Curated annotation (Swiss-Prot):
Keywords, in A-Z order: Glycoprotein, Isomerase, Signal
GO biological process terms, semicolon-separated: terpenoid biosynthetic process
Organism: Phoma sp
Protein name: Putative hetero-Diels-Alderase
EC number(s) per entry: 5.5.-.-
Residues annotated as glycosylated: N26, N41, N47, N135, N211, N310
GO molecular function: isomerase activity
Disruption phenotype: Abolishes the production of eupenifeldin.
Gene: eupF
PANTHER family given in the database record: NHL REPEAT-CONTAINING PROTEIN, NHL REPEAT-CONTAINING PROTEIN-RELATED
Transcription recorded as keyword: no
Source species taxonomy: Eukaryota, Fungi, Dikarya, Ascomycota, Pezizomycotina
Residue intervals passing through the bilayer: none
Matching SUPFAM superfamilies: Calcium-dependent phosphotriesterase (SSF63829)
Length: 352
């Protein structure tokens, strides 16, 4: 068995027939796919966002906290370049989300080492902005806010009606030290951040549906988040659930707060994307597979483990649909391998 970290972007053709009714017997499953780009060993690609021009932006956690761009990803061999290194503020990046057109919030922190399983340094998480709106080829960047009370900032989602305000998921992982010594189950939480002023605050915590329980080992709870209309959706890596809750115009859950279980599947969720054609379908990355889930609770793996092609998906971390006429039916997936065994049926994920 080899041990290294390898990062990649995969492309999946998401046929509308599959989107409409994902079922285990669908003869389009597994979906057609191809490898779009693979970074050198030692690179950890964590999250993805799609620019208005269709280019992909991906964040890296190793060897440094950078944003990379995959240009015109619908091409056979797209150009890939680093567009910004955030080393002034962080060692690693995790989440990325678009606010205004071609403006993005990224989150990250200092870490004890560049090792893939290194712990973050306590009280060093922050939110930063990457701005292409003034120059589409050479973005500017700024620090929005230090968020020292946070633990492991993860997903970023803008409020659709106020895109300068974002919600950020926070995985309470007790690892702000070089060696983990406490595996007490811990709560997850969600922050709201005004990107104009840098003001932030907690909007949701102390709910079992957000929490880390370590049911699957030293894993995290709440992970990727998305907002559609006034519904906040999230995945919980630890308890296998996809959830949603109503939020108000300030991004605060509407009382009485009772998170709704949308769907459940025995996997380790990481992130999700809304279907561009069918509001009843969510796409999500899990343990070495991509899944399609309906809001009435149906879930089916569409690529990777659980289909006839178990070797497609090594450690997927995030996914996003294309935004142009050329690729609006294409799902782009980032992935990492931390431990590379002979079979992906037992692979260990390399993402948060």
């Amino acid at each position: 068995m080899r041990y290294h970290l390898s990062a990649l972007v995969l492309v999946f053709t998401a046929f509308r027939e599959t989107l409409t009714a994902p079922t285990p017997g669908n003869n389009t499953i597994p979906l057609p796919n191809r490898l779009l780009h693979q970074w050198p060993n030692g690179t950890w690609v964590e999250n993805i966002s799609v620019r208005p021009n269709g280019n992909l932006l991906v964040t890296t956690s190793t060897p440094d906290g950078s944003v990379w761009q995959v240009k015109e990803p619908w091409k056979e061999n797209p150009e890939v370049e680093r567009v910004f290194n955030f080393d002034e503020w962080v060692d690693r990046l995790i989440g990325i989300g678009e606010t205004q057109d071609d403006k993005y919030v990224v989150v990250g922190s200092r870490f004890y080492s560049t090792d893939a399983q290194s712990s973050h340094v306590a009280r060093t998480f922050c939110a930063m902005e990457l701005d292409f709106s003034g120059n589409t080829t050479e973005p500017s960047a700024r620090l929005i806010a230090w968020m020292p009370e946070s633990y492991l900032l993860q997903g970023v989602a803008a409020l659709p009606w106020d895109r300068d305000t974002v919600l950020i998921s926070d995985q309470y992982v007790l690892r702000p030290r070089a060696v983990q010594i406490d595996w007490t189950p811990s709560p997850g939480q969600i922050w709201v951040l005004d990107t104009r002023t840098g003001e932030y605050g907690l909007v949701m915590t102390d709910y079992a549906e957000l929490n880390t329980t370590y049911a699957k080992g030293p894993d995290v709870g709440i992970d990727g988040i998305k907002i559609r209309d006034h519904d906040l959706f999230w995945v919980n890596q630890d308890d296998s659930g996809i959830y949603r809750v109503k939020i108000d115009d300030a991004g605060v859950p509407v009382a009485p707060v009772k998170p709704q279980l949308v769907a459940s599947y025995n996997t380790m969720w990481d992130d999700m994307a809304f279907d561009p054609f069918n509001e009843n379908v969510i796409w999500a990355t899990g343990l070495n597979a991509v899944f399609a889930a309906t809001l009435d609770g149906q879930i089916v793996p569409v690529d990777g483990v659980g289909t006839s092609d178990n070797l497609t998906l090594p450690g997927p971390t995030a996914c996003a649909f294309g935004r142009t006429e050329k690729d609006k039916s294409i799902l782009y997936v980032t992935g990492n391998l931390l431990t590379v065994p002979e079979s992906l049926l037992d692979v260990k994920l390399g993402g948060w």
